[in-house]
Amino acid sequence: MITTEIKRVKNHINGEWVESTGTEVEAVPNPATGKIIAYVPLSPKEDVEKAVEAAKAAYKTWSKVPVPNRSRQLYKYLQLLQENKEELAKIITLENGKTLTDATGEVQRGIEAVELATSAPNLMMGQALPNIASGIDGSIWRYPIGVVAGITPFNFPMMIPLWMFPLAIACGNTFVLKTSERTPLLAERLVELFYEAGFPKGVLNLVQGGKDVVNSILENKDIQAVSFVGSEPVARYVYETGTKNGKRVQALAGAKNHAVVMPDCNLEKTVQGVIGSAFASSGERCMACSVVAVVDEIADEFIDVLVAETKKLKVGDGFNEDNYVGPLIRESHKERVLGYINSGVADGATLLVDGRKINEEVGEGYFVGATIFDGVNQEMKIWQDEIFAPVLSIVRVKDLEEGIKLTNQSKFANGAVIYTSNGKHAQTFRDNIDAGMIGVNVNVPAPMAFFAFAGNKASFFGDLGTNGTDGVQFYTRKKVVTERWF
């Protein structure tokens, strides 16, 4: 339940809410108002060690629970999430700032991830081949790996944790969760509902905090695997440090997602698609469209319509259903984004829609409106860097080949989209683009939970992505058995 009182956030270890053993805390503001809504502990190493010990103890029995029973337990959790969808969405809007519409969509995507986890009995099935040699049978069996951990970002405080711990737990592991210190309240509610569903103590543990918690997770010898979603520099650090310490690591990193707009596209739907991808959730998502490569033949018409429609978007508190763009997560991030907009102007790009100039009614929140640049090139920081904001760069290209070449020049390769009505164009794009997730007339090509989620190049460090069969393989180890009976 959402209240107006300032909350002091706790950790959840071994089935109980406990104060951090440390004394350092960080204020959590509502991004739409700047007012403090909570204080979150910056937990020390000792709290992580306690959480790992609890998870180790729980693993001894949880890993032995029959797979269908674990699945049934998750069904109870799934039901509770569905029953509390409205409350969960409101918590997201309160502490993250995204509009209630966007938050509601996130809640549904998180629920879909839990639906995948309930199907673990099917996904964990092994393989067998009888009579591989005279009187000898061969088979592959999947087993849980032990205590695993997840480190998640602020921008999807429900969906991304639910990519991780339900599937890991369904596979028989126990879990230590470290969510962003910027959005601790939703994490609390997810854990409350988890134990309300009747799970044994210690199966899921929540440690709030910052860098010290991350480092403690990466260094703890009893944690077998780490899942991470966040920025490219931190993802690289998590991958290198975790693997150096003998852990299995999947680290989903930054992005600079491109869309190629072809002359044969459906103009109206393409414009609305680009707006939704670039500006919804205030652009704070790793699958947001941040660069449009538009073919010269349609460029002027596309840009005219895009600019006109973008100028209609309202900016403000996410609880107001008339608003399309909510606040950014923090004042410091707002200042960083304004710096990028200023650099684009200084570098010679044409500012078609200026998000620095927004209505005064938005108040004291961390607001930047939808922003569009034209005349952008690959030498500009606004093309090169992940800005993580409602800032869109337009590059004009002569044809599909140049659009693909431009897209592949980015160091990132998370998602990419083509807008076209030509199947051959779509096929050429699919076969030649570097991105790990590709959309054809799909604005945000983030796959459903039963498909793997992972980019390429500097957008992903590791081998197996989250979700789908990749997720099951990541959270299990296989044993190959060759047997003969006399």
Swiss-Prot record:
The superkingdom listed in its UniProt entry is Bacteria
Family annotation (InterPro entries):
Ald_DH/histidinol_DH, Ald_DH_C, Ald_DH_CS_CYS, Ald_DH_N, Aldehyde_DH_dom, MeMal-semiAld_DH, MSDH_GmP_bac
Q: In which pathway does it act?
A: Polyol metabolism; myo-inositol degradation into acetyl-CoA; acetyl-CoA from myo-inositol: step 7/7
Q: Any idea which UniProt keywords this protein has? A: NAD, Oxidoreductase
The reaction(s) catalysed by this protein are: 3-oxopropanoate + NAD(+) + CoA + H2O = hydrogencarbonate + acetyl-CoA + NADH + H(+); 2-methyl-3-oxopropanoate + NAD(+) + CoA + H2O = propanoyl-CoA + hydrogencarbonate + NADH + H(+)
Single Gene Ontology MF annotation: malonate-semialdehyde dehydrogenase (acetylating) activity
Supply the enzyme class, top level. Answer: oxidoreductase
A Pfam family this chain is assigned to: Aldedh
Q: Indicate the residues that form the catalytic site.
A: C286
At which positions is NAD(+) bound? F154, K178, E181, R182, S231, E386
What's the EC number here? 1.2.1.27
Q: Which cysteines are joined by disulfide bonds?
A: none
A single GO BP term for this record reads:
thymine catabolic process
What PANTHER family does the entry give? MALONATE-SEMIALDEHYDE DEHYDROGENASE
Family (UniProt):
Belongs to the aldehyde dehydrogenase family. IolA subfamily.
Role according to the record: Catalyzes the oxidation of malonate semialdehyde (MSA) and methylmalonate semialdehyde (MMSA) into acetyl-CoA and propanoyl-CoA, respectively. Is involved in a myo-inositol catabolic pathway. Bicarbonate, and not CO2, is the end-product of the enzymatic reaction.
Subunit architecture: Homotetramer.
Q: What is this protein called?
A: Malonate-semialdehyde dehydrogenase 1
Question: What taxonomic ancestry is recorded?
Answer: Bacteria, Bacillati, Bacillota, Bacilli, Bacillales
Q: Which gene encodes it?
A: iolA1
